[in-house]
């Protein structure tokens, strides 16, 4: 797809679409329409008063004016919902530069528009989640044909904005098939508003269950259209049995690694009081105690499921790191850095998707490495390599600590949960109780999230029986790390490199370490669970990491050869788990155990995928718009493991 939708500009500054032969809007008309036809036409902000969440679905994002007006109204409303979801389908996204050129002049809206434009990039076909207001205003963009995207995605809408170029110029957006697809996402009572009063649109809406009426329009139009989804028949399909609204109460998250902290953060933003329990004395004592790791997208010629999933994860991880830094919980440059990552294809050249055009939105994600980047890494000009733009390094323990410091999250260490039991309370509402080996109560809550990694199956078996175990494979990983000498520091590239293991070349070390450190790893020791590893295993892993580095970055290896020739001084080892298809596991544990969910099996991509999976878990729990394509979400669903037994 092209870099962005071409835009012409009329003498009065109005954006004009050469593709459709029509203007987007004038500034005054566009704002009036956004405020009165759409926001007011759907009864907002009054309709969302005191709601836990509100979900707006729009056709035709354009320059985002309807979103900006809804966001502005949400900020100004003391009775606003805890979360505002705005979901918009757009086949031809404009560029961030064009968005800036068309910014409204009102100061308040202009500030919001600049924040939107800053995030408005890398919009390849698919689903993109952009977060604002510390994750409480969530924009989900469906990039692609509106009809196809609406048929494929999962959302229950409270309000619908039916927008776009006129039916004469863009008939597909107003077709009966599109209106049918919209109706599939309605609950009874969903309000719809549009400026279009064409007879075909009125009849199409009525045919698909909407009660339609004309209302006074915004000049120069005499009328607008208002509709309420209230079919005379009982709907079938997804809207027939809407998910029962869940009230945030108490939640126990078992496991204080990256996955557990991600679940705690996502649920606390939705009003849950979360207690995170772990056997260790401090958070991030397991696999998340890694000195530093990478978040980075994966690339493949066919743009595989993993490639698309990892882009969604990298975008959300970077956004969360920025958000936590804005709250003063992380320090950029010390706890994390979006350096970009060079991927050197030692065993096979990294291949970008075949259908990516350059220039194009894919350039915001990954592109061929430049001569300067290869030179900086000490690699030859013809080395097979690509550059990942939205990527960098993180100190996992600091990320975990930051998420556990969010309001509504409480840490409880030295909590050795041996069994979970579901019991009724005096008030009649069942709760889960976490019990130690002696049967003592450690904590109780209405919801439990298992983020235990290799300890998941033991707890499932002790709590639900042997048949509850999942087919998870333990994989031990070991890295080598140390403090730089002046000579080794000079041999390092200025950015991380992956492709055959990965090297974080320079990062601040905690405590009293004298200078920056480096990290190289990791090994993949399947079915190995012994911790700490034996001295012999540590030495073998140290040698393996050195051998990988020698192939990945010969110059960097020469600078660190003294470290690798000597016995390991600083190593780290932990056990991760992977599912049979090497994808994370997100969702309910069993129909027979209501309120028991899991977030696990991040494998070697915990920093890239855990935060996305935390948002997916919360979205599934609360019947929210999903933060990724529904097909990707289905691939991560815990229900798939039951089918493998």
From Swiss-Prot:
SUPFAM superfamilies from the xrefs? FAD/NAD(P)-binding domain
Q: Does the keyword Manganese apply?
A: no
Its GO CC terms are:
cytoplasm
Cofactor requirement: FAD
The entry's keywords: Cytoplasm, FAD, Flavoprotein, Methyltransferase, Multifunctional enzyme, Oxidoreductase, S-adenosyl-L-methionine, Transferase, tRNA processing
Query: Where is the region tRNA (mnm(5)s(2)U34)-methyltransferase?
Result: 1-230
The cross-references to Pfam families, in alphabetical order and at most eight, read:
DAO (PF01266), Methyltransf_30 (PF05430)
Q: Which InterPro entries match?
A: FAD-dep_OxRdtase, FAD/NAD-bd_sf, MnmC-like_methylTransf, SAM-dependent_MTases_sf, tRNA_MAMT_biosynth_bifunc_MnmC, tRNA_MNMC2, tRNA_S-uridine_synth_MnmC_C
What reaction is this protein's catalytic activity? 5-aminomethyl-2-thiouridine(34) in tRNA + S-adenosyl-L-methionine = 5-methylaminomethyl-2-thiouridine(34) in tRNA + S-adenosyl-L-homocysteine + H(+)
Its GO biological process annotations read:
methylation; tRNA wobble base modification
Q: What Enzyme Commission number(s) does the record list for this chain?
A: 2.1.1.61, 1.5.-.-
The function of this protein is: Catalyzes the last two steps in the biosynthesis of 5-methylaminomethyl-2-thiouridine (mnm(5)s(2)U) at the wobble position (U34) in tRNA. Catalyzes the FAD-dependent demodification of cmnm(5)s(2)U34 to nm(5)s(2)U34, followed by the transfer of a methyl group from S-adenosyl-L-methionine to nm(5)s(2)U34, to form mnm(5)s(2)U34.
Q: Which NCBIfam families match?
A: MnmC_Cterm, tRNA_MNMC2
What is the official name of this protein in its record? tRNA 5-methylaminomethyl-2-thiouridine biosynthesis bifunctional protein MnmC
| Source organism of the structure | Delftia acidovorans (strain DSM 14801 / SPH-1)
Which gene codes for it? mnmC
């Amino acid at each position: 797809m092209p870099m962005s939708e071409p835009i012409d500009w009329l003498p009065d500054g109005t954006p004009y679409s050469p593709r459709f032969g029509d203007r987007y809007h004038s500034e005054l008309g566009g704002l009036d329409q956004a405020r009165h036809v759409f926001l007011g036409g759907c009864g907002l902000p009054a309709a969302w008063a005191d709601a836990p969440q509100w979900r707006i679905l729009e056709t035709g994002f354009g320059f985002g004016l309807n979103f900006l007006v809804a966001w502005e109204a949400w900020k100004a409303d003391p009775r606003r919902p805890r979360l505002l979801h705005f979901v918009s389908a757009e086949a031809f996204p404009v560029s961030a530069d064009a968005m800036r050129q068309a910014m409204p002049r009102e100061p308040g809206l202009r500030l919001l528009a600049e924040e939107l434009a800053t995030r408005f990039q890398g919009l390849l076909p698919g689903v993109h989640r952009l977060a604002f207001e510390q994750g409480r205003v969530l924009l989900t963009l469906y990039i692609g044909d509106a009809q196809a995207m609406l048929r494929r995605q999962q959302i229950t809408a409270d309000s619908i904005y039916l927008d776009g170029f006129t039916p004469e110029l863009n008939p597909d957006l107003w077709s009966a098939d599109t209106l049918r697809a919209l109706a599939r996402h309605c609950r009874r009572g969903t309000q719809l508003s549009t400026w279009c009063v064409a007879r075909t649109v009125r009849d199409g809406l009525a045919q698909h269950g909407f009660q339609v009426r004309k209302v006074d329009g915004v000049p120069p139009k005499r009328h607008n259209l208002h509709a309420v989804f209230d079919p005379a028949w009982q709907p079938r399909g997804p809207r027939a049995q809407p998910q029962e609204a869940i009230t945030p109460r108490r939640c126990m998250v078992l496991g204080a690694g990256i996955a557990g902290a991600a679940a705690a953060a996502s649920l606390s933003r939705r009003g849950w009081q979360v207690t995170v329990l772990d056997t260790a004395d401090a958070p991030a004592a397991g696999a998340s105690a890694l000195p530093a790791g990478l978040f980075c997208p994966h690339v493949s010629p066919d743009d595989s499921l993993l490639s698309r999933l990892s882009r969604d994860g990298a975008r959300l991880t970077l956004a969360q790191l920025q958000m936590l830094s804005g709250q003063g919980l992380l320090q950029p440059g010390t706890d994390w850095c979006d350096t970009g990552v060079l991927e050197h294809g030692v065993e096979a050249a990294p291949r970008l998707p075949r259908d990516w055009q350059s220039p194009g939105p894919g350039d915001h994600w990954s592109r061929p490495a430049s001569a300067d980047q290869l030179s900086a890494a000490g690699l030859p000009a013809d080395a097979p390599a690509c550059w990942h733009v939205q990527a960098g390094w993180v100190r996992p323990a600091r990320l975990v600590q930051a998420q556990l410091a969010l309001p509504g999250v409480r840490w409880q260490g030295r909590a050795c949960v041996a069994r979970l039991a579901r019991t009724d309370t005096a008030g009649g509402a069942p709760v889960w109780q976490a019990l130690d080996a002696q049967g003592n109560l450690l904590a109780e809550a209405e919801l439990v999230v298992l983020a235990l990694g290799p300890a998941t199956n033991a707890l499932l078996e002790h709590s639900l029986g042997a048949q509850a175990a999942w087919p998870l494979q333990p994989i031990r990983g070991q890295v080598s790390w140390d403090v730089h000498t002046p000579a080794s520091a000079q041999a390092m590239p200025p950015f991380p490199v992956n492709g055959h293991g990965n090297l974080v070349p320079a990062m601040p070390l905690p405590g009293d370490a004298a200078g920056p450190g480096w990290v190289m790893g990791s090994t993949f020791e399947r079915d190995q669970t012994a911790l700490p590893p034996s001295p012999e295993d540590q030495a073998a892993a140290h040698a393996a990491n050195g051998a990988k580095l020698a192939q990945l970055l010969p110059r960097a290896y020469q600078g660190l050869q003294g470290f690798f020739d000597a016995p390991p001084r600083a190593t780290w080892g932990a056990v991760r788990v992977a599912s049979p298809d090497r994808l994370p596991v997100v969702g309910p544990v069993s129909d027979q155990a209501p309120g028991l969910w899991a977030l696990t099996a991040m494998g070697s991509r915990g920093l890239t995928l855990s935060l996305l999976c935390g948002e997916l878990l919360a979205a599934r729990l609360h019947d929210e718009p999903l933060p990724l394509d529904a097909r990707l979400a289905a691939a991560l669903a815990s229900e798939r493991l039951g089918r493998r037994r």
